[in-house]
Amino acid sequence: EISKGNIKVSLGNFKLLELAQKLKLIYKLNASANKVSFFYRDKKIKSYLCDFGIWLELFCYINLKRNRLFHDVRMSVKFEWNNTKRKLMEITNEIDLTFFYGIHPYFISCKLSEPSADALRELSMYPSYFGGGNSKSALVIVSKVNKERSYTYTRAKDMGITLIDGAMIKKG
């Protein structure tokens, strides 16, 4: 814990803010007697930093980048399914993370809780459309999944989707 005047800020939280400033995500970080203040670099950064779901995506992104076995790691990739026949109707999907392992594409969806059947179907579609048998998808869920009783686990396994739950994340 650090004190600046009468304010006490958890050292871990303040170090995160200092890191965010160093990374130019925020600026004018200031701790006074009554408050800690800063400015976000832009609206997009603010929305990312205030959205709990983005933290799981960032956690996965950072770990994929650190691993160095994977390349072309990307976050929030949008797919546009438009063709000349459907000019008036825009059809898009977004996948949380994509990367390559060698020449094989991988697709990851990050969820705070067990997803809907529609979300699983969407995730299962990417490998067959973009890489066939050489492509894989994974679902990362913050909560722990009971593998014996979970519809999500059973359905994901049947669809060829690797499931990584909170218990596996904690193990590393």
List the predicted regions and their residue ranges.
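Intrinsically disordered, low-complexity Ser/Thr/Pro/Gly-rich regulatory segments
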Residues: 1-172
